[in-house]
Amino acid sequence: EPTIKGTFYEDFSNGIDSDIWEVSSQKWGADNNGTSPDNVFYSTDETRVKNAGATGGIAVLRSYGDLQANSAKRRQGAALITRQTFGPGKYEVRMKVLPRLGQCTAFWTYYSNGGQTPETIKYSEIDIEMPMEGSFKKWSGTSYERFIDWNILADRQTVMADEPEKGGLNDGQWHTYAFEWRTDAANGDRGVIWYRDGEKMGEAREFVPNYKAALWVGNWFPPDKSWVGIPDFEEAYMYVDWIRVTEYDDPVQEGGGGSTARAEATDLGTKPIPQNDYISNGKFSSMENGVLLGWEGEGGTSSGSGSDTYLNLEAGKKLTQMIRAQYSGYSFTLSAEALKIVGSGKCKIYAEYMFGSVRMGKSEAIEFTASDTGKKNLNFTIDNNRVTDLRIVVETEEGTTAQVTNIEMFLN
């Protein structure tokens, strides 16, 4: 049994303290816009935190995908980094993963002295990362002993959890992810073991780091789409309830990784904790290259101005939007507002249940007619085990045009 040296515990009951956390503005990797303090929020509102199923406070980390109207913010995430460094021990986080593909939600340790040769590099990194292979039914753990770049030196071991029978990691529930890092080789205990909700996922016995490192939690945009998928969303959020590091008295060398950069997270005060709206450009305000951003199909244009924008959909036309990596058992509330319907037919809005490009079924529909407009809601649950994605459909019958806005969809 390891000897416990000390415990670091953060439940954000005092918000995000800049003396404890660096609110990241760092950028790494290619083809992204880094991380921004503008994307980091917290709530200590007792009622809101309790209603969200958390204790203390909640850290909220935003991410912008490719369907964000402001292209300068696309592929921009958020991260928190401890100023303190830690050695071997058990690292735990209770969080809700950011539920969209194209980004990487991660919990990791990191230190590098910047050495560029095998003789001079000092390095330490252990990762938990998701999704994998464009699926939220897969996640991975990686242990790095040394790393310069993928061409020179990358001493690492990765284990992957492929959990096809479980509900996806993006099910909207709190899950506790953990890894236990041991360096007590003299007693035969050197390695890293990963856990989800207390259940062992895998272990690495090679390439175990030897240096103390800072701890990171957040989301970012890797350039490799075969890894994380395509970020075809507008904005999305991950949530952190608490983080705990139980440090062991195992052998370790001094490393580093905490920085002195200072930025403040935003206190939400009494405002609601922002929720994930799965619809992109649901007010139809963003056009790009003459087409509605995030929507496929013909016959739809953006009308109105300012905050009062809407979709003008011609008669007998259909627009669709894919929402990937959504699985059986997930339940949603879809809502929409019809401003005006002209003609004797209907405007329908519904979800199709997709397995790749094959339609496996569909939800009931929100229906509008010339005499029945306004705002309507629809609850539906994906009921087919093979479903991998949703496709949202907005369509008009022949001879009927529609003005529609405020399409939203939230996980129940």
Give residue ranges: language-model regions:
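GH16 jelly-roll
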Residues: 1-268
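Extra-cytoplasmic beta-strand recognition segments
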Residues: 12, 89-97, 284, 315-347, ...
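Beta-strand-rich interaction surfaces with strong enrichment in secreted/lumenal proteins
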Residues: 77-84, 160-168, 204-205, 309-311, ...
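Extracellular beta-strand ligand-recognition surfaces/modules
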Residues: 105-110, 226, 284, 377-411
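Extracellular carbohydrate recognition and processing domains
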Residues: 133, 358-387
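Conserved aromatic beta-strand anchor motif in extracellular beta-sandwich/beta-rich domains
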Residues: 194-196, 349-355, 409
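Aromatic (Trp/Tyr/Phe) and Gly/Pro-enriched flexible surface segments
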Residues: 263-318, 404, 408
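Extracellular ligand-binding interfaces
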Residues: 337-370
